[in-house]
């Protein structure tokens, strides 16, 4: 009998250990097009009212993975090529998912993160401060994003198979720099000594495979702003991380057009708050001298202060950095590579979520430096003076400087005309001088969120912390350490913590309390005051412990429903017209008869307004290669890196417009006979929309 008991216990022990070594999940990945109106709508990111879309360089996509454990616990994570995420948008996605799947998906187990591209159409956030430079809410942007976000999760769900998840990491050194190094230096020296760099250089990858080890997808997190494309860009772009995703997907979806194919590869945002891709550093535009370290200003006559990337222009910089990120991810996926350090993810799936009313949050936190318990509280949302100064990725307007800790009577007068802060607000935010008292502004509706979304997704021994803002480098490091320690203390397991930035709702930035004192751009944009980061540390520690204990928490107060109060100054398309003796689709400028490698093809069509039809999951044009006498094959689309689509009005009163299509012929281009086809819709002056098509004559691409 004793031997039987020992054998049974041994069997249980072996079974437990085997469970740690290998775990079977249901895994699925999906992708969908979320490209909004590419023309006449401002882009979201730089808050530059002049940055109005004029066409497409690359389409933007949403990419999802779904994981379910053996008990049926399920989570969904989405990385969207968008500036950030809004709660109204997430709520609409959940509504559509529940109409299809019932309560399988809900607010607690779905996380939607933005890559932070600054080159996609805005107007979807439903808070005035974030939509004001877009001239308000844009229903067309909102709808295409809501449907695409829903579709990518649906496709991941429909693709669920038994599979495994592997985690791996690598160091990528030549992609990011800290754009506020003087703020970073405010953090304690003993803390900084624990890290080699002032930005996170680790790329973390989750690889999804089926039980035959066939690769399904790979999601990569790396801390870098998607701002290789600067605020002069007018073409829809997924920027550096989006290009990296296109390269990764091209590798594992051979002979497929961008955005097509079963393999899904994503590069997701992390604690990128103070992290720039413009690795050549900030310089004065005229003199070439370095900018002032504290204020990021240049002396009179030396030009503006801005940073640049490693390429000769923003397109090449985007390409270079995207390639470096893709190469790092490919190295991890190549099992024969020295970079491959993959280990299997094991354990159950859990999730937890809570809405937190930040201005009314009161708590306490232990300060390891002073070894005392500090009281913490939130403030009404407010933006500081340095917010208006912009960053070295995109300088602001007027004479504002980063690092400003004093106010100005003139700007205070302007501020108070909009909404005046109370004396309590002013004291609460010190040393930030308040430029916009957004928490007190209510006309025509809420300017910034007061209620935030805090969420954790646990997939085995990996925890994804979904944060509603842009954490700086050290702010993210502290949060990761806090969550890891809490999970270890309660669950007794060592976890890998991933920060997913700009998730579920957007509330600008979060810096450490020390960085807050410097009041550079990121600190001025930390909207809930100097204790913002401490509150998040408190909340996420509590949520981690509750999740590890399988406890439920109070849902918290829901953000307000604002769909019915949205305003917009954007007009729709009135009508389209064309010059006499032409028609829509007429090729005004034909290609040359012959081109060589590294040359650019340009053609021009008489066109309708692209806002008439977004051609979602389709394309405004195709570049086709002749296969034989009866067959042409699509070689490139408007989602391809090698192409650009530029639209412009030629007569506003008569509704005339033209479409320029550019194709850069790369060394990888096959020689042969090509032609370009443009598809569109025009809006008739008496009503209705009608399709049209135009086709160039054929031309030859010579062998190199």
UniProtKB/Swiss-Prot annotation:
GO terms for biological process: ceramide catabolic process; chemical synaptic transmission; hatching behavior; long-chain fatty acid biosynthetic process; photoreceptor cell maintenance; sphingolipid metabolic process; sphingosine biosynthetic process; synaptic vesicle exocytosis. Its EC number is 3.5.1.23. It is an enzyme of class 3 (hydrolase). Pfam families: Ceramidase_alk (PF04734), Ceramidse_alk_C (PF17048). Keywords: Glycoprotein, Hydrolase, Lipid metabolism, Secreted, Signal, Sphingolipid metabolism. It catalyses: an N-acylsphing-4-enine + H2O = sphing-4-enine + a fatty acid. InterPro entries: Ceramidase_alk (IPR006823), NCDase_C_sf (IPR038445), NEUT/ALK_ceramidase_C (IPR031331), NEUT/ALK_ceramidase_N (IPR031329). Residues 1-23 form the signal peptide. GO terms for cellular component: cytoplasm; extracellular region; membrane; presynapse. Changing residue 264 to M: In slab1; induces embryonic lethality. One of its GO terms (molecular function) is N-acylsphingosine amidohydrolase activity. N-glycosylated. It is found in: Secreted. Glycans are attached at residues 230, 362, 550, 598. The active site is at 276 (nucleophile). Widely expressed in different tissues but enriched in neurons at all stages of development. Overexpression rescues retinal degeneration in arrestin and phospholipase C mutants, probably by facilitating membrane turnover and endocytosis of rhodopsin in photoreceptors. Belongs to the neutral ceramidase family. Hydrolyzes the sphingolipid ceramide into sphingosine and free fatty acid at an optimal pH of 6.5-7.5. Acts as a key regulator of sphingolipid signaling metabolites by generating sphingosine at the cell surface. Regulates synaptic vesicle exocytosis and trafficking by controlling presynaptic terminal sphingolipid composition. PANTHER family: CERAMIDASE, NEUTRAL CERAMIDASE. This is Neutral ceramidase.
């Amino acid at each position: 009998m004793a031997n039987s008991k020992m054998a049974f216990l041994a069997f249980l022990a072996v079974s437990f250990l085997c469970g740690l070594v290998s775990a079977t999940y249901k895994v699925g990945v999906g992708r969908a097009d979320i490209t909004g109106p590419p023309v006449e709508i401002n882009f979201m990111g730089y808050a530059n009212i002049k940055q109005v879309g004029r066409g497409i360089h690359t389409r933007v996509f949403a990419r999802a993975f779904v994981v379910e454990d053996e008990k049926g616990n399920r989570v969904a994570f989405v990385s969207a090529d968008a500036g950030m995420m809004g709660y109204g948008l997430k709520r609409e996605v959940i509504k559509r998912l529940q109409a299809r799947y019932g309560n399988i998906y809900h607010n607690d187990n779905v996380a939607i993160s933005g890559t932070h591209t600054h080159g996609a159409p805005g107007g979807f956030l439903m808070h005035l401060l974030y939509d004001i430079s877009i001239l308000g809410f844009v229903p067309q942007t909102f709808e295409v994003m809501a449907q695409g976000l829903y579709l990518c999760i649906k496709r991941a769900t429909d693709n669920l198979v038994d599979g495994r998840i592997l985690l791996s990491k690598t160091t990528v050194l030549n992609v990011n720099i800290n754009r506020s190094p003087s703020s970073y230096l405010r953090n304690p020296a003993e803390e900084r000594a624990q890290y080699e760099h002032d930005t996170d250089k680790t790329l973390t990858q989750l690889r999804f495979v089926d039980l035959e080890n066939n690769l399904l997808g790979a999601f990569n997190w790396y801390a870098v702003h998607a701002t290789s494309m600067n605020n002069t860009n007018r073409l829809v772009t997924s920027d550096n991380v989006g290009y990296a995703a296109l390269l990764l997907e091209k590798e594992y979806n051979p002979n497929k057009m961008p955005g097509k194919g079963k393999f899904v590869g994503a590069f997701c945002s992390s604690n990128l708050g103070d992290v720039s891709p413009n690795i050549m550093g900030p310089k004065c535009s005229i003199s070439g001298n370095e900018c002032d370290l504290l204020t990021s200003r240049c002396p009179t006559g030396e030009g503006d202060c801005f940073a640049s990337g490693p390429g000769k222009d923003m397109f090449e910089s985007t390409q270079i950095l995207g390639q470096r990120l893709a190469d790092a991810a490919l190295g991890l996926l190549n099992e024969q590579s020295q970079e491959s350090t993959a280990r299997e993810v094991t354990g159950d799936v859990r999730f937890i979520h809570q809405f937190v009313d930040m201005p009314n949050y009161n708590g306490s936190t232990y300060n390891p430096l002073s070894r005392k318990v500090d009281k913490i509280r939130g403030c009404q949302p407010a933006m500081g003076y340095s917010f208006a100064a912009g960053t070295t990725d995109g300088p602001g307007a007027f004479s504002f400087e980063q690092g400003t800790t004093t106010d100005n009577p003139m700007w205070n007068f302007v501020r108070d005309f909009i909404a005046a802060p109370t004396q309590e607000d002013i004291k609460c935010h010190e040393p930030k001088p308040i430029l916009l008292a957004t928490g007190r502004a209510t006309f025509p509706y809420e300017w910034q969120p007061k209620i935030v979304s805090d969420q954790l997704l646990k997939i085995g021994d990996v925890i994804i912390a979904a944060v509603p803002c842009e954490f700086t480098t050290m702010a993210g490091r502290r949060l990761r350490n806090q969550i890891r320690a809490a999970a270890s203390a309660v669950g007794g397991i060592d976890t890998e913590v991933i920060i997913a930035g700009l998730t579920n709702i957007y509330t600008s930035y979060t810096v450490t309390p020390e960085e807050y004192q410097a009041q550079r751009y990121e600190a001025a944009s930390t909207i809930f005051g100097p204790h913002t980061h401490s509150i998040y540390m408190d909340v996420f520690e509590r949520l981690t412990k509750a999740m590890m204990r399988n406890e439920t928490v109070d849902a918290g107060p829901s953000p307000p429903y604002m769909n019915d109060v949205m305003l917009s100054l954007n007009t729709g398309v009135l009508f389209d017209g064309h010059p006499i003796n032409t028609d829509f689709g007429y090729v005004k400028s034909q290609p040359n008869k012959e081109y060589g490698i590294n040359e650019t093809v340009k053609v021009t069509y008489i066109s309708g307004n692209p806002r008439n039809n977004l051609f979602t999951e389709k394309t405004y044009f195709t570049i086709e290669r002749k296969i034989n006498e009866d067959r042409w094959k699509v070689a490139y689309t408007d989602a391809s890196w090698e192409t650009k689509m530029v639209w412009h009005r030629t007569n506003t009163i008569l509704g005339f417009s033209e479409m320029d299509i550019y194709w850069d012929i790369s060394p990888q281009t096959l020689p042969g006979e090509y032609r370009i086809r443009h598809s569109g819709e025009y809006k008739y002056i008496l009503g209705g929309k009608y399709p049209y098509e135009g086709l160039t004559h054929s031309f030859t691409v010579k062998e190199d």
